[in-house]
């Protein structure tokens, strides 16, 4: 095969590698010399050597005919020899002849967001025939689908609903990108507006852009748009409408600005078919009388604006050398979709080694902020800076600045003239229905055959969240290297633009509904870094721009930051790359820890399964993860898929539980009641610890030790399934019955021994629990749990017996009775476990890893003993140890506890240990959910934004590694006797302060 046949042949009219490296092979536009010469086509002469075609032009120069190839007119779309390609509209659309133009202006000061006062009015309008219709556009549903298009749209005379009155505002939206369906005057200075849905659909009412004339200065007008469909909007979070005044632009050079008072977004009463609509209302005073003004949802950027911008590039002799403009395809309305190829031209084969970067924008026509980001990118990449030149020398940029020009022209918000969302049809084979996305996918596929594509980014706008962020792709295999690598570029972007880009808002999952998006399709085609950049319609909540709106310069600056981050990502010096990789690894540890802390209904089995499927489960090492043994054990467990129960089985379960409750009620009626404490029902609820929920270990989900049973009047009663009763009922029993029920005639001590092989069992031994009755010392029967030899079987049985309600609910269709039974069982277990006085351990930031391993090691038997005393106070001294925060801490719960009025559990030295929490205390836990490019206390003074020093947590981790090497078989020290620590001051152990816990029970 010849070399020419190997050249890239784009049937979709994209540029080839030959076009990238050499001068344009087609003839230049006809200059003055050729204009004076005769031009003939090859079929107009009878020369047998020339084929009969109209594509060859013959120029008579210097006494001879010179053949030239005719260049297709629409290959470029924009040129210096003629006017721009006219826009084509659906034939039924009315279009005014006036050309709408706005100046490009940026306010000197950031525009603040609106702060609601709570006094905003919510106007509700009823349909009335007496109201005056001020504006009514042509019916959007005149045709059920797109038929054909023409330049200028409908050529019939335009209709004007009312004449130019003295005090009535005049509205107009029949221009490019305009959107307004109907305006009704409901008051002297109050107007009800309705925006038009996307053509050939009945939804997507979000974008508005209209003109207002015949204004009067100094009068408060109210505008209310009544047919929005989204329940949530940024207007309720401080966003203001945009306003433009032609008199302000001509007199003071002021362009688009944020305005409005009494802004309110609310649900109205105009719902149809049970679908509620939402209204946006605001008040405003026009600055000038008899002015022509505009209101818009976001800064408009029309198809004509793009053509003028591309025409300027084509007319520039410098930029046109490395920026080739072609027509990718035509839309169904025959409007052109442009594609730009930006790279430094080379005449050798070195250009084939360049990697490619692909950018697209405006697939949703109402997201105009994406066009402003694209404009900022093109301004920078086509500039004269050294970084821009380096980017052009390194990469080949393929840019599609406007994927949906038809929707932009008619003023749609989301769809094309096919009535479909193009960003859900990248997998479609219907080239005629979705030409722009079909040709884009085809162009990228052919490009990937020639060169590597390192990044794909589709620019969008977001209507519900602030800041700028990205959506990425994360595969189901969750390989750790790829899992973190896909997050490096967004993290670099957040470092380069910390006041606009939010890394914490980025998401990297693939939903089934998003499988047709460009991001997911390109990722499945093999582009590893495939992103969707979302820019808010509102503003920022970060840094110096917090609480302010984004303007056009802010959006354009994101194009520069994108290029800057691309250079950092591909820098031969991989320092920044590996630094971000290390930070992402640390972030994952904290995020997983927060996920366990925040999920109060997560059972031990769910945490284990989450660890198995996480990116760190296969790569965690024993030196940096305190739960390595847990992961090793659980990695061998094969979970079984739970089968759904039939209706008959569920009914039998309900009947069985009802019988159990009836038997228990019968026992209570006979007086055979069991009371483990002397307090009444109200006192029992007050015996819960009065400390922070973040400090409670998840002992409440563990299985209780075997309690045996008491024999009362010939009946068996299991203590593990009892109900607390009041003191008055106990007093009704005889003294012998009370002793028998409360176990005071038994031995004076009960010991709960740990099961050495039970990973989820209680790893403690509790002695001398005081339960006085009539000033007598209670005697408890000692019962010891027998360790189970089969650890694997015991681990599976424990996890199977104590799943959370949330996990059960996902697999079984629970009835109300089953839910109530399940909750009652959990409450009973919680009440029973409180009586064993389980130790409460604060999560400290600097606890050593080796010691915390021993806390959770089932083979380490440590005891917390309590000396039996007649007094009501039990003092426990608990020594805190130093440890590194584990990746996933499975024993922390956020269960809400009722604080005891007597505060029977009080930490004596709370402040000394508060600073050692891994999340900075209960109020600072959310810190790790947001990534900020700011210097922390643990960082040394860095010369740049990328120079960092190891944090304190990393230093503590190194210390813990050294400690682990020196003491591999170390065990946890037994806590000192409580009587010896009374009145002592907190001491330090291993460099960390110890704290005391004081327990007091009411007698």
Curated annotation (Swiss-Prot):
Domain annotation Peptidase M14: ranges: 299-570
Q: How is the cofactor bound?
A: Binds 1 zinc ion per subunit.
May I ask which residue range the UniProt record assigns to the signal sequence? Answer: none
The entry's Zn(2+)-binding residues are 364, 367, 460
- Biological process per Gene Ontology, one example term: proteolysis
Keywords for this entry? Carboxypeptidase, Cytoplasm, Hydrolase, Metal-binding, Metalloprotease, Protease, Zinc
Question: What GO cellular component entries does it have?
Answer: centriole; cytoplasm; cytosol; microtubule cytoskeleton
| Catalytic activity, as annotated | (L-glutamyl)(n+1)-gamma-L-glutamyl-L-glutamyl-[protein] + H2O = (L-glutamyl)(n)-gamma-L-glutamyl-L-glutamyl-[protein] + L-glutamate
Locate the compositionally biased regions of type Basic and acidic residues.
649-662
Quote the Gene3D superfamilies the UniProt record gives: 2.60.40.3120, Zn peptidases
Which residues carry out catalysis? 534
Which EC number applies? 3.4.17.-
What cofactor does this one take?
A: Zn(2+)
Entry-linked CDD domains: M14_AGBL2-3_like
- Can you tell me which family this protein belongs to? Belongs to the peptidase M14 family.
Its biological purpose is as follows:
Metallocarboxypeptidase that mediates deglutamylation of tubulin and non-tubulin target proteins. Catalyzes the removal of polyglutamate side chains present on the gamma-carboxyl group of glutamate residues within the C-terminal tail of tubulin protein. Specifically cleaves tubulin long-side-chains, while it is not able to remove the branching point glutamate. Also catalyzes the removal of polyglutamate residues from the carboxy-terminus of non-tubulin proteins such as MYLK. May catalyze the hydrolysis of aspartate from the carboxy-terminus of target proteins.
Its recorded name reads Cytosolic carboxypeptidase 3
- Tell me which species this is from: Bos taurus (Bovine)
Q: Which gene encodes it?
A: AGBL3
